[in-house]
Amino acid sequence: MTDVEHYESLLAEGPFDTESLTVLVVAGATQQDVATALGIDLAADPTEYPEADDEEFSAYAITDVEGGVLAVEHSGYADPSLDALRALSAGGRSVAVVRDNIQAHVRFGCARDGEVVFDDDEYLFLDDPSPVPAELRPLFDLAWVDPEDEDAEDDADAVAVGLAMAEVVTGLRLTAEDLQRVADSGYRLAPSLVYLPDAD
């Protein structure tokens, strides 16, 4: 099973509706580090995911995984800002985010040592793939739709490809147990619409 197939299986059999989803993976961080970067009050009691539509807030579930932290939210509109990625990767850490939403905008972003390495709001349709790090390019190419190729097809699951790239960046391989544990951990409110794709 390839890395992408591993994540396709996790998504297909896991506890989440993947139509709208943000997955944040941080190596070397604590839950408090992640909560602070996302604007979450970790002292608040966890609850079920809020059902009401709220443009200002979503909610994250956070859990420890071997070597770091996994955080998940279900709106696809509360993915972390670039500043949050920088903060989470400071001090030798690494972080990656994969986001899909009802607009079918699939984001992949990553940072190391306090610097954003790559980020794109719709990475499948990137006009110029040259900014993609060489270590990610073989996986990226599985999902990328080349605008110059009239016969291009996006058969690969872009979220699964994103998670495979997140593993390359962070060194953390997510498991079915990780996904179930984060789903069972409960949710805490987090602000929405904090990501600005073109922010420096």
Model-derived features: where do they sit?
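Hydrophobic alpha-helical segments that drive targeting, anchoring, or assembly
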Residues: D3-A134, L139-P147
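Long, compositionally biased intrinsically disordered terminal regions
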Residues: V4, L10, R112-D200
